[in-house]
Amino acid sequence: WNHYEMVYMLLAGLSTPLVLSVHSIVSFDFATSVIPGWHTTIFPPYFVAGAIFSGFAMVLTLMLITRRVYKLEDYITIYHIELMNIIIIVTGSIVGVAYLTELFMAWYSGVEAEQYAFYNRATGPYWWAYWSMVTCNVISPQLFWVKKFRTTPWIIVLISIFVNIGMWFERFVIVITSLSRDY
């Protein structure tokens, strides 16, 4: 068990900076681009928060299924699940604030192409993807403020699946809506 604990701590120590560096570097690739909709400095913390957000949602989905199949209710308690849901509320709120910050920065910059890129995301040909992203990533996690939703396993699985669908839509919206037209 000593070796297990040592390796466990080592992997935890390695994976934390790995997550931070990978998502920060990818976000800088976008942020240093001149393509409207990508050229924003909010991307590094936004991508890291999104990674934590979607990671917790995926872990919750798999954990609750595993908990049920292998009858681990005595080991993985509602208390543990509720704490994870609180992290989803916090990171989902951070992602929501990042969406609003992106819109504000596009408006405040006065750059017409940036303003159009964000207006086009919400009302253009891919409006359905944008609003699906907002619904899944910002609105659905807010249901966890209600204790019944935070402690009912099938509702938690449903919301965490919505979060992961929303994070897929986020990548779609960032990449496709910015590249789908010429500026």
Give the location of each predicted region:
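Long, contiguous internal "core" modules enriched in hydrophobic/ aromatic residues
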Residues: W1-M133
